[in-house]
Amino acid sequence: MRPKKLNQNKGSELLRKLMTERNYLILGVDGGGTQSRARLCAYSGRLLADAVSGPANLRLGTEASFSSVLDAARQCLKDAGMAQQNLSRIVACLALAGASEPGQLEAAKRHRHPFRAAVITTDAHAACLGAHDGKDGGVIIAGTGAVAWALLKGKTYRIGGWGLPISDEGSGAWIGSEALRRVLWAHDGRIAWTPLLRELVADFSDDPHAIVSWTAAASPREFGAFAPRVADYARGGDPVAIELMRTAAAHIDSLAARLMALGAPQLALVGGFAGALRPWLAQQTTSQLVQPAGDAVQGALTLARATAQSLQDVA
């Protein structure tokens, strides 16, 4: 009996699919102000490796951001037992902090990379995609920075996240900056010293001038390093720490209120400082929060896979 002849169109489609699965690797990167997280998958979706590297905030420089991205990609390949030459097989989505600024986004798009293809978007966009599995919704990122993002009926909305010192209220970096401001207030006699403030000034050898010099060159990540201590002292009853956490939460409440006013059916709160802030949020905010379906890395993988599919379609 002669074998059944494969339909030519179906055969070509199957061949393209097999070639795509063999040749493309999918990489999703969530590049934030403190660290970058990456996940490498086969085109089929099979997980190959995860990795963590340094920050990838475009406001701190395109070169530094791509260095962190490449560190994570190389680590993924190493952990997956694959040669570094496979960088050229990767279709990536780089979801980077600072990519919402047009100039920084264009500079990132022009930057050379070793990947087969790379789409660049904001970390907030990827977080929103991941949190709601591509469905309509809003997300608030409370990490080193703070920004709100919504995907509603095919449109995107961004609130806040313009960066320190002008924005990012409620973020870890903002809390750290405000805590040091209050150290100077206490030094000037404008407010009373508290255990938190005395510990912070001790970090600078009790010298307010050292604080001023340090802040002139400090990055958001460095400011944000003080935020966990503020949260710890707030739980212990320190009045300045409590005031800072309440004020930070009020800023996050404001972002949530704006997302709800835009029509977001549900909200997700994510980011490295989200857990510390959640107990301080208003009930109106917490009542709208849902458990994220996925994270920003998952959202980035969704976009990377769509890009790989488009490459397959034109092959």
PLM region spans:
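ATP-binding/phosphotransfer module of carbohydrate and carboxylate kinases, centering on a glycine-rich
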Residues: 2-4, 10-88, 130-138, 180-315
